[in-house]
Amino acid sequence: RGAAWGAKFAFSSIPDTSETMLYNLLVTHHNVGARDHTNSWGDDSTTAYTARCRAIDRFSWDFEDSMVAFAITNLTSQVRTPENAKSALAVSATLNAPNQSTNASFGGQGPTSDQRRKPEVHAPGDAIPSTGTGSTTATAVMGGTSMACPAAAASGTLIRQFLKEGRIHDGNPNANFVINPSGALIRAMLMTSAVDMAGGCGYPSNREGFSRAFVAHVLALPCG
């Protein structure tokens, strides 16, 4: 059913990717209640900090309660844009369960062109059941960082729910622990939750980032 299967969502196509368009699109989604923004698109032609990156960082500054996640490039070289925005949660992919502790064969790595660590986290993104084409009920099995990013963003949504309902102490609602989290806090808790993956050079690193997000490390999740 997905990581945050009870959540509501808003979605839009991307008619162009100018700074103004991207900023305004994020604001539009914020205005209808969206707080965790997942994006499975990018520009593989450059590693530079671009106007799109500026739009993400400006939005994250202006709307501090929002968290913006981006799938990193599937190329196995340096991360591209706009996942290299300072405030973006850049997401790479692992294999699917039961091999979720293994890096997928695709996905870029840091550092960014200005020497910041990316990606931040990994999530399952290989052999993922998804919607297909041809009919309204079609399904397909797909792979890519585009599949991993929604899983990481949904994990952030679960963290947000626990914080807003005061569940962070023991998993039960408690008004004494209710907070309205910032996007930066959601991002930080996802990174803090991470567990090391098999092989590779360990974490944190330019290949793994802070490694695979695992929200059970920061949330008192119910059993079963």
Where are these regions (language model features)?
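Subtilisin-like serine protease catalytic core
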Residues: R1-M21, V32-D36, S45-Y49, D62-D65, ...
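Structural detector of well-ordered beta-strand residues that form the stable sheet scaffold
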Residues: A10, M67-A69, P129
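Acidic glycine-/aspartate-rich tracts in secreted/extracellular proteins
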Residues: P15-D16, L95-P98, D126, V195-A198
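Active-site neighborhood of phospho(di)ester-bond hydrolases with catalytic His/Asp-centered motifs
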Residues: T38-S40, V68-T73, V91
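Sec-exported extracytoplasmic/periplasmic mature domains
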Residues: G42, D57, W61-E64, N96, ...
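Catalytic metal-binding/acid-base residues of hydrolase active sites
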Residues: G42-D44, I72-S77, N96-A97, A127
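Extracellular S/T/G-rich loop segment that most often corresponds to the catalytic His/Ser-adjacent loop
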Residues: R80-Q161
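Secreted peptidase-domain scaffold signal
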Residues: I168-D170, F177, P181, C201-G224
